[in-house]
Structure formats: structure tokens, C-alpha cells
């Protein structure tokens, strides 16, 4: 059994050793909740990695969106190359849940596009938890949605070893039962093929490696792993576990039992609808449910089988669904990253799901058991936590109330200080800001401006563009890929000024930013709360020459608290630097930037120099193209699609220029 072991040239510095010791001691003392209050750029991820290494517990890291989850996953893979680090997020590229709008009598069918690569990673995560303890899973809030019963999942897992007495047809039957399909032509993930005495399987948790079971009569002679693309043998296996192709797979016995319960619930519900004189709804429900029952009986599943998950699990009405949290051992450790954002997100999930399901049940599209295919309520989520570390620069009341220990991490390894904050009057703020922008850009730095409304962001962008400032705006209407493109352009200097609303809070750690301007800072509200202001101020904490300007006529409570907190941290940081003779230095290229797209900008910046280096060393262009193509495939494999696209463009340019 592997142990967590960090591979890094860095050692904990600054506040990190004290924070690590404090939190590890608290966890070992059996405390349920603790908080890591770490400022931007203080190396919170490295602290988390050290806590995992010291406590040796299976770990779940909860992030508030897919992008940050992917970034954290990549960082932890670097820290723990010899351990299992998995990525668990929603596998939908596009998802339209089924819904009914009574006002217009409109039923919207469920429509979804599933990302096969992410589905594979989800299976890889759950199967890893069944096999090992040295497992870290980085997940989005998707992990609080129903996932199927882990006990049934374990029970249906097929365990095979050389020398076992197993009939080939018996193994095939079991594979079909756990929703694998036979396909001798299009051999893909979740399928198997038969070639003489050999049975080839591509497990649900892999797409590049297959398992070959070689039979001799009724005995398993040998088990080998092979490359799906080339067919080359990779190695011998002494044991293999084939996990179900679906998290909602169930045994024949469970399905038969479930069908009887579904039929009973249908009968009860039809009586209720008929008594209420809802003849159309009763007819609709009968037709739809009987069709689902027939599909389950014949195929072992039906479209929307998750709506019957409570019955398949054998749970009572109203009980919480089984989720990824139930796949972890009882002593697992959880980190909630950016907890001030993630926890409210977890809290909001249940209500939205319930209101949509109510219409579906009332109007005969679903049985009441559909209510129990849902995310966890917040109280249920709390009850499933064993031990948790809340991680945030601005922890909320909940985190502080539920923590026995709060460990502060204020010192940055780079010696960088929290920025200087200036307060200037609102009158003439735009003209004053224009002067500051010019001075900042002339020094080769960038500017972030936060406004209160989308309209103001757009108007200010237009105004600055008319003054020949390279400005652009970013708000909620801009999709993720466009957002990444804008950040890349900002880092490259194609854009000097980025204007936004609250999108400028978490996840925009850009070292080139030397000025953050907060317009209308005294308009108290959620965009100008203490938490929002501290997070926004933090965007200027990656550059040694940065400052923050708040435009305000009054000093609100939130402003006062955020300014005092920033000043408190700044004093601690300056004293530490003086004591240890540290000069603050701008991080030009951190361990890894939070937004994945920023890595692409570094690729583009280095592109010309790479080509020049290659020319000096007499490396042929063909060789360089080959190298970039390998990197592109690796990036796509690691879900770094923006980086892969950038490399693709570089390859295209190289090919055109070499003609």
C-alpha cells in the first residue's frame, strides 16, 4: 500500500511550517473543523500537500468550479507523482435537465452531451477509492449529487486472478450484467471483445489500456495489460478488478426487487392522481413509467434511471442519496478550497433541484421517488464530513464558528507584501484613473478595474478605448473560453486594462498587474463587502510594485475592516522580511497559475525564443514540429484544451513558414 510522499524542490517557508504543524496537530487530536486562513500567493496548496503527507489520510479537495478543480488536480499530481490523484467533476459538456412549464404546457426532455474523457476520470476516481488509501480526489460540487450505491458498486466489481477456475462465458455474462457491451469492431471504453480463448476488456476507468484474460479450459491462464492503440503487451497482471461501466449498475436480483417497488409506487401515485381528477397526468405517468420498467427488465437500465436511484439503493423516501463522499473510508480528510464561495454553492444546490422536480411529479412526468435523486441538503453534507480544513483568504462566519483552530498564513515565500491602499474622492475618478493607467502601462504593467454594473464596465471600456487605451471588459455574459482568452491577452500585453464586476475576485492571480482600481468602493453591498474587497485587493498581491486605489467619498464598515486587515498583514509581512533580510520579488511564473489558460500565454511568449534556440542548435523544423505535436497530444490528454489549441496554432505557423 503506497504512502503519500511529496516530490518537490521546495521546503515549507514563512508561515507555512507553523500552519502545517498547527493544522496537523488539530487533525491528529481528532478535531472536526479547522481553517487555513491564507493570503493570496502564500502557498496554500503546498501547505495542503504537506498536511496530506503528514496525516496520510485519503483526501477529498472540494473546489467551486471545474477550472479551479483542474488546476488543483494538476498541482497535486506534480506534488504526488507516485500516488493516485483523480479529477471528479460533472461529466456534462452540455446539460438541459428535464422540466415542465405548466403555464405554457411545455415539457422539456432531458438533453445532455457527456464528455467521455471526464466520465472515464470519474470511474477512475471511484475505482481508486476501492483499491487504495493513498488517493486524493479533487472535485467540484458535482460530488454532492447521487452516484449510485458504493456497496452495490463493490459487490458488482469483478475480481480476477491467474489460476482462478472461471468459465469464459460466465465472465462474459457478468460483464454484460455490469453494463459492458460486446463490440468486436469498435473496441472502446466500457466494451469487450472475444478472440478464441482470449477475452479483451477496456475498463470503464481507462481508454488507452486494455486487459486481456487468457483462458485455458475453465481456468484463467494469465492476465495481461495491453496498449489499445498498438496492441503491444505492457505487462503481466497478478490481479485485476473490473468495476461497473455505470455507477448506477445493479445486480439482476436488485433490479427485480426494484421493479416490484416501482410498480407499487406507480399504483399508489395513480390512485392519488385519479382521486384529484388528474386523468391526463395519470395516463401520462402510467405510460412513461411502464416504458421505463420494460427497459430496466430487458436492458438493465433505462434513460433517466437515476430517478429511480432511491429504489435501486433500497433507501426510504426522503433519505439522502449515496454520493462520492460515501465511497471514501470513514477516516477521510476534506479540504474546502475558497470556502467562502464553495460553501454557499453547496448550500444552494438542493432548493433549485427541488423546485424543478415538483412540477415533474405534480403533472405526471415522474414518480415521487424522483425527488430523492438530488444533491445533498447542507445538513446532510455536514453529517458526511469526517474532518475538514476550510481554506480561504476570507473565511466566513460559518467556517470560523465550525473551527477549533484557525491557522494564519500571512507570509509569502516570495516576500511579497499586501499592497498599499489609497482612498481618493469619487468626483473626477475617471480622469484620475486615466492618469494612473498611463503611468502603470508605461512601467510595463497591467491594470484591473472593478465596477458595480455591467453597463458601467462596458461604458468605461469604450471611453478608455477612445483614448487609445488597450482595454477590455469581462462579466458573466462572457463564456469560460472567452474569459480565458481575455486573461491570456492581458498577460501577453495585448490588453493593458481589464474591467470587470465580481469576476475579478477569485482565481485571477496575474503577476503583471500593478494597479487594482475599485470604483464606488463606498457603495455597501455584496460586491463591496469586506470579503469581496479583501479578495479584490488580493489581485494586486503578486507584484512588488502594486497598489490599490479605492474611489470613495465615505469610508464604509467594509472598507474600514478590509483596509485595517490588509494593513495588519502588511506590518507582519514587513517585520518578517526585515528580520530575515528578504527583498520582495514579483512572481513572474508561479508554480502554476490558477486559471489554466494563463499557462498558454507563457507558451506563446516562449514560442519565438524556442524557434530561435532551435535554429542556433541546427534543430530541423520537422523535429520541432514533432516535439510540439507530442506536447499538444499530452496537453489534450490532460484536459488542457486551450494549451493544446495554442500548440496547434504554433505547429500550423511552423508548417506554413517552412514551405
From Swiss-Prot:
The Helicase C-terminal domain, residue ranges: 429-582
Name this polypeptide is given: UvrABC system protein B
All copies of domain Helicase ATP-binding, residue ranges: 25-412
Record text on subunit structure and interactions: Forms a heterotetramer with UvrA during the search for lesions. Interacts with UvrC in an incision complex.
Family in the record: Belongs to the UvrB family.
Amino acids binding ATP: 38-45
Short motif Beta-hairpin, span: 91-114
Domains: entry comment: The beta-hairpin motif is involved in DNA binding.
Domain of life: Bacteria
Protein localization: Cytoplasm
Species of provenance: Clostridium perfringens (strain 13 / Type A)
PROSITE patterns on file: HELICASE_ATP_BIND_1 (PS51192), HELICASE_CTER (PS51194), UVR (PS50151)
Coiled-coil portions: none
Pfam families for the chain: Helicase_C, ResIII, UVR, UvrB, UvrB_inter
Amino acid at each position: 500500500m503506497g504512502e503519500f510522499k511529496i516530490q518537490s524542490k521546495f521546503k515549507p517557508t514563512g508561515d507555512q511550517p507553523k500552519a502545517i504543524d498547527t493544522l496537523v496537530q488539530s487533525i491528529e487530536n481528532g478535531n472536526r473543523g479547522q481553517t487555513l486562513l491564507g493570503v493570496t500567493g502564500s502557498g496554500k496548496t503546498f501547505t495542503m500537500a504537506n498536511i496530506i503527507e503528514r496525516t496520510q489520510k485519503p483526501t477529498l479537495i472540494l473546489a467551486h468550479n471545474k477550472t479551479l478543480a483542474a488546476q488543483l488536480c494538476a498541482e497535486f499530481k506534480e506534488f504526488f507523482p507516485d500516488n493516485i490523484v483523480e479529477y471528479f467533476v460533472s461529466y456534462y459538456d452540455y446539460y438541459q435537465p428535464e422540466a415542465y412549464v405548466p403555464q405554457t404546457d411545455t415539457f422539456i426532455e432531458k438533453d445532455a452531451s457527456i464528455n467521455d474523457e471526464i466520465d472515464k476520470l470519474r470511474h477512475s476516481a471511484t475505482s481508486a477509492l476501492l483499491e487504495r488509501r493513498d488517493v486524493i480526489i479533487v472535485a467540484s460540487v458535482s460530488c454532492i449529487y447521487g452516484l449510485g450505491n458504493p456497496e452495490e458498486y463493490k459487490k458488482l466489481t469483478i475480481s480476477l486472478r491467474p489460476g482462478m477456475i472461471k468459465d469464459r462465458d460466465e465472465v462474459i455474462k457478468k460483464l454484460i450484467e455490469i453494463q459492458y457491451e460486446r463490440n468486436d469492431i469498435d473496441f472502446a471504453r466500457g466494451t469487450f471483445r472475444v478472440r478464441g480463448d482470449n477475452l479483451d476488456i477496456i475498463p470503464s476507468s481507462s481508454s488507452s489500456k486494455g486487459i486481456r484474460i487468457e483462458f485455458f479450459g475453465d481456468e484463467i491462464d494469465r492476465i495481461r495489460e495491453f496498449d489499445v492503440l498498438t496492441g503491444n503487451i505492457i505487462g503481466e497482471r497478478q490481479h485485476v478488478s473490473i468495476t461497473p461501466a455505470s455507477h448506477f449498475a445493479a445486480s439482476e436480483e436488485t433490479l427485480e426487487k426494484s421493479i416490484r417497488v416501482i410498480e407499487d409506487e406507480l399504483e399508489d401515485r395513480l390512485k392519488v392522481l385519479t382521486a384529484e381528477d388528474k386523468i391526463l397526468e395519470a395516463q401520462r405517468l402510467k405510460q412513461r413509467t411502464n416504458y421505463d420498467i420494460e427497459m430496466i427488465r430487458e436492458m438493465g437500465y433505462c434513460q433517466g434511471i437515476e430517478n429511480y436511484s432511491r429504489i435501486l439503493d433500497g433507501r426510504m423516501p426522503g433519505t439522502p442519496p449515496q454520493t462520492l463522499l460515501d465511497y471514501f473510508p470513514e477516516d477521510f480528510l476534506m479540504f474546502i478550497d475558497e470556502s467562502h464561495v464553495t460553501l454557499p454553492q453547496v448550500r444552494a444546490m438542493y432548493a433549485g433541484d427541488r423546485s424543478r422536480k415538483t412540477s415533474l411529479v405534480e403533472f405526471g412526468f415522474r414518480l415521487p421517488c424522483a425527488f430523492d435523486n438530488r444533491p445533498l441538503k447542507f445538513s446532510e453534507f455536514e453529517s458526511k464530513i469526517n474532518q475538514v480544513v476550510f481554506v480561504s483568504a476570507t473565511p466566513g462566519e460559518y467556517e470560523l464558528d465550525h473551527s477549533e483552530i484557525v491557522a494564519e498564513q500571512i507570509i509569502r515565500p516570495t516576500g511579497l507584501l499586501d499592497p498599499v491602499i489609497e482612498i481618493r474622492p469619487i468626483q473626477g475618478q475617471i480622469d484620475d484613473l486615466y492618469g494612473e493607467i498611463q503611468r502603470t502601462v508605461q512601467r510595463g504593467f497591467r491594470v484591473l478595474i472593478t465596477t458595480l454594473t455591467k453597463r458601467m464596465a462596458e461604458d468605461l471600456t469604450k471611453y478608455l478605448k477612445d483614448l487609445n487605451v488597450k482595454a477590455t471588459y469581462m462579466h458573466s455574459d462572457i463564456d469560460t473560453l472567452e474569459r480565458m482568452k481575455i486573461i491570456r491577452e492581458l498577460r501577453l500585453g495585448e490588453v493593458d486594462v481589464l474591467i470587470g464586476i465580481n469576476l475579478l475576485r477569485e482565481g485571477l492571480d496575474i503577476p503583471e498587474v500593478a494597479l487594482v482600481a475599485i470604483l464606488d468602493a463606498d457603495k455597501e453591498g455584496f460586491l463591496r463587502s469586506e470579503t469581496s474587497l479583501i479578495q479584490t485587493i488580493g489581485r494586486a498581491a503578486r507584484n512588488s510594485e502594486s497598489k490599490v486605489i479605492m474611489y470613495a467619498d465615505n469610508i464604509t464598515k467594509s472598507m474600514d475592516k478590509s483596509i485595517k486587515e490588509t494593513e495588519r498583514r502588511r506590518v507582519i509581512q514587513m517585520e518578517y522580511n526585515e528580520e530575515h533580510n528578504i527583498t520582495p520579488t514579483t512572481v513572474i511564473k508561479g508554480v502554476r497559475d490558477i486559471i489554466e489558460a494563463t499557462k498558454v500565454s507563457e507558451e506563446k511568449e516562449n514560442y519565438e525564443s524556442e524557434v530561435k534556440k532551435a535554429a542556433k542548435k541546427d534543430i530541423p523544423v520537422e523535429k520541432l514540429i514533432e516535439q510540439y505535436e507530442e506536447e499538444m497530444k499530452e496537453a489534450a490528454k490532460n484536459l488542457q484544451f486551450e494549451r493544446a489549441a495554442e500548440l496547434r496554432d504554433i505547429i500550423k505557423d511552423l508548417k506554413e513558414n517552412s514551405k
